[in-house]
Design a protein with these regions (language model features):
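Short beta->alpha connector loops at strand-helix junctions that form conserved
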Residues: 90-92
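A short N-terminal helical cap/helix-turn-helix that marks the beginning
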Residues: 4-26
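Conserved small/polar residues in nucleotide/adenosyl-binding loops
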Residues: 116-122
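Conserved AMP-binding/adenylate-forming core of the ANL superfamily
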Residues: 26-70, 74, 78, 95-100, ...
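Structural motif
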Residues: 67, 113-115
Length: 125
């Protein structure tokens, strides 16, 4: 694959899916259950997330991802870009002031949070 002819990470991902066998392992999550996701599983989840995200945002909207390092982070990131959004990843280790600054600066249309125990400051942005 000549990646110099590709325009985005999304395009690279979907080109790669054409080259690999769908059942081939792609992502492994070591916590909590050491689950392995194959290319087919991941692509299906990305398409489903893309459809949902497209129904919630407009082209160019910023979408925040608050998540640990896990397979769904990658799936969400690709789905946001595939839906025409701009991914704004933030770490779970940030302080409340960091979150507030980022939220005020980027004004996301969508916030994806991996677990309900992860919280952001509660106010309208």
């Amino acid at each position: 694959m000549d990646i110099s002819k590709l325009n985005s990470l999304v395009e690279l991902y979907f080109k790669k899916t054409e080259e690999v066998e769908g059942k081939r392992p792609f992502l492994k999550w070591l916590k909590p259950d050491k689950r392995t996701y194959n290319w087919e599983d991941v692509t299906e989840k990305i398409y489903k997330l893309t459809a949902k995200i497209k129904s919630l945002i407009k082209q160019g909207d910023r979408c925040l991802i608050l998540s640990e390092n896990r397979p769904y982070w990658l799936m969400t990131d690709i789905a946001i870009m595939n839906a025409g959004g701009i991914s704004v990843p933030i770490f779970t280790t940030y302080s409340a002031n960091d979150y507030e600054y980022i939220l005020n600066d980027c004004k996301p249309s969508l916030i994806s949070v991996s677990y309900t125990h992860l919280t952001l400051p509660t106010r309208s942005y």
